[in-house]
């Protein structure tokens, strides 16, 4: 199933940030929702600023409109303020997009563990995000950095413990 673009995406003024404060806030909210929905649909976690600016997300070739780099940065800053984005490098060119925050991913993973009677079991990180048992689960294919943050959130709640097994990491659920 393809991504369903919101109506604003085909409205040329959407690609120019508006000067009116109220209008701009609504526009940034719409852009934030669009970015999170698009990343969720396409299972995107780690992204590059230049690549995303050229992607269909900010570049509608059908109406020949593209959000400027400066405006893309404003949208990304809005997402950062809401806790949905974190810069990976100092020059703000790569970022982690969090359409689910780590604690939310932790809950999803823990529900799967509980539902399948796997508490008191040890998993490698690979098994959780790439194993046959998790095929079809929403967290299958999750970025490893995001998985670790999710498991750290569960560790804070005493529901899991991250362990090192030889050269790889694993997790035990309680």
UniProtKB/Swiss-Prot annotation:
The gene is vps25. The keyword Acetylation does not apply. Its main location: cytoplasm. Belongs to the VPS25 family. The lineage of its organism: Eukaryota, Metazoa, Chordata, Craniata, Vertebrata. One of its GO terms (biological process) is protein transport to vacuole involved in ubiquitin-dependent protein catabolic process via the multivesicular body sorting pathway. It is found in: Cytoplasm. Keywords: Cytoplasm, Protein transport, Transport. Component of the ESCRT-II complex (endosomal sorting complex required for transport II), which is required for multivesicular body (MVB) formation and sorting of endosomal cargo proteins into MVBs. The MVB pathway mediates delivery of transmembrane proteins into the lumen of the lysosome for degradation. The ESCRT-II complex is probably involved in the recruitment of the ESCRT-III complex. It comes from the Eukaryota. It comes from Xenopus laevis (African clawed frog). This is Vacuolar protein-sorting-associated protein 25. GO terms for cellular component: ESCRT II complex. Component of the endosomal sorting complex required for transport II (ESCRT-II), composed of SNF8, VPS36 and 2 copies of VPS25.
